[in-house]
C-alpha cells in the first residue's frame, strides 16, 4: 500500500521552508550544487507560480513533507526542460517515492508542452533509462541524460 501522496509543492511559508530544509539536509555531498541561498531562491519561486517551472512534493499520511523535486525550462535552450533539486528523506528511500516524483514531473512536462527534451544530471543512469532517457555524456561518474518527446 502506498503511504504517500504526490502533488505540487504547497506555497505556504512553512512548506517552502520545509522543502529547503529537506533538500539541504538530504544532499550534504552536493553542498556546492545545493547551496542554501540557491535553494531558497529556487524554492521561493513557487510563490510566483511560473508556467515554466514546477516543484512537486511527496507527503506522508500525516501530511509531512518527505520528498521534493523540481522541473524547469532551460533559459538557454528552446523546448528544453531540466529535472533538478530532488531529495527524498532517508527513511522513505526505496519505497517508490523518488520514482513517483520523477513520473509526476515528466507527466507535467508532457501535459504542458507538446514537444521538446528533458535533461537530467545524475549518478543513477538506470533510474532514468526506465523513463527512456538516453546517455549524452559521462564525467566523474555523473551522467548527462536526455529524454526527447
For every predicted segment, state its role.
Residues 1-43, 55-59:
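Short amphipathic alpha-helix that is part of the acyltransferase structural core
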Residues 53, 140-144:
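Short hydrophobic/aromatic beta-strand or adjacent loop that forms the aromatic wall/cage
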Residues 57, 64-73, 80-82, 87:
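Conserved beta-strand in the GNAT
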Residues 88, 94-107:
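Conserved acetyl-CoA-binding loop-helix of GNAT-fold acetyltransferases
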Residues 122-141:
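Conserved active-site alpha-helix within GNAT-family acetyltransferase domains
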Amino acid at each position: 500500500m502506498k503511504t504517500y501522496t504526490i502533488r505540487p509543492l504547497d506555497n505556504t511559508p512553512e512548506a517552502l521552508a520545509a522543502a529547503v530544509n529537506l533538500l539541504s539536509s538530504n544532499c550534504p555531498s552536493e553542498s556546492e550544487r545545493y547551496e542554501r541561498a540557491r535553494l531558497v531562491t529556487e524554492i521561493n519561486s513557487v510563490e510566483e507560480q511560473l508556467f515554466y517551472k514546477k516543484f512537486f512534493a511527496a507527503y506522508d499520511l500525516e501530511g509531512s513533507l518527505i520528498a521534493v523535486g523540481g522541473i524547469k525550462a532551460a533559459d538557454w535552450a528552446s523546448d528544453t526542460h531540466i529535472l533538478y533539486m530532488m531529495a527524498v528523506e532517508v527513511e522513505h528511500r526505496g519505497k517508490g517515492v523518488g520514482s513517483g516524483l520523477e513520473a509526476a514531473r515528466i507527466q507535467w512536462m508532457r501535459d504542458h508542452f507538446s514537444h521538446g527534451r528533458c535533461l537530467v544530471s545524475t549518478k543513477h543512469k538506470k533510474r532514468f533509462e526506465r523513463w527512456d532517457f538516453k546517455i549524452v555524456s559521462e564525467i566523474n561518474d555523473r551522467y548527462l541524460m536526455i529524454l526527447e518527446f
